[in-house]
Amino acid sequence: MPARPGTPTLLREINDRTALELLLVSGPLTRAELGEHTGLSKVTASQLLSRLEARGLVQVVGSRAGGRGPNAALYGVVASCAYVAGLTIGPDSVTAGIADITGDIAVEVTVDPNGADEPVRVVHDAVDKAARSAGISFSDIRVFAIGTPGMVDPRTGDVRFSFDLPAWHEGVLDSLRNDLGRPVMIENDVNLAALAERSVGAATRESDFALLWLSVGLGLGVVIDGELYRGRSGAAGEVGYLPVPGAPAPVTVAEPRSGALPTIGGAFQALAGGETVMSLAAEHGFDAPTPGAAVEWAVTGGESAEPLLDELAGRLAVGVASICVVLDPGLVVLAGEVGLAGGEQLAARVQRRAAAMCPNPPSVVASQVEANSVLRGAVLAAVERARGEVFAGPE
């Protein structure tokens, strides 16, 4: 297939996008500084800034003193040139965040989904509330990105099934697009957490890593060569079903209910899932209301609580070693409420135990993404899409 010729229009589009991305990363620059960073002549840089200013994408945000002569104008990206919405959907809560083109989340609201049995209504109402809180119109939102538990078909972008959200099934993507009237992306929640970790967390320098989500349920986000790996059907990362030593084999997986996978009766989920973590805490004398609370107690409870941390680390290491001998990610990030509560104390223990079980021991660290990593990943995915549209050229 012949390459697209370097027409003046195409070259302008490339230069414009390069300049906008540079301004987002570096902050405001003068015309001369922009030329130095991009290699553009002063005349070309001036023409570029005039174009972007006319499109409402950049503006003068200040000035900088130089040598002789007047101060030079500083140009920055107009943050309000596009807004996006990121959402996390769960059976007990729905959180919506509004961000501008910089990716900064301005407003975050959480609403009761009432079981999330009406996906379109739930999403629309949550975004409407967030938009009003942000002081923008619903129509100002350019892209929506939604994180859900369960499997998303990588070929269609639609939900295949969500065990915790039975109303979220095939066809929901079209329904959301018809209602919202804008591009909508649905992604597995753990995959979005991995995107956040790659962009602003512990994996910013890694092109190959795995994020192990530890909460009530278990999940895995895999990044290979800088890209999410979803598998043929979107089931990559369903590590709750991973057969591991020390857990009964999940004999019911071959008999799923219509539209959903069965409850996990064994495997890694039984060895290290949330219910097991709370049961282990009870055995060690602590009645924990959540898996995260159990691990927080183990971290802060002194010598009497350390056996729980050691026990959990040993169980997690079995899964980590199994993952690493297949994928060899180099880095494993422990995320979710258990990973965050355990911090580096749990991560270091898991690393030591995993190193004894596999020939390619990984580095194991705790997540460094603050607050809601799934929401952060959803916003980042939406911003990337919005930038691609807004920066591409005049509509």
Which role does the model predict for each range below?
Residues 1-63, 67-140, 180, 247-395:
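ATP-binding/phosphotransfer module of carbohydrate and carboxylate kinases, centering on a glycine-rich
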Residues 87, 101, 143-262, 383-395:
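Phosphate-binding/catalytic loop of phosphoryl-transfer enzymes
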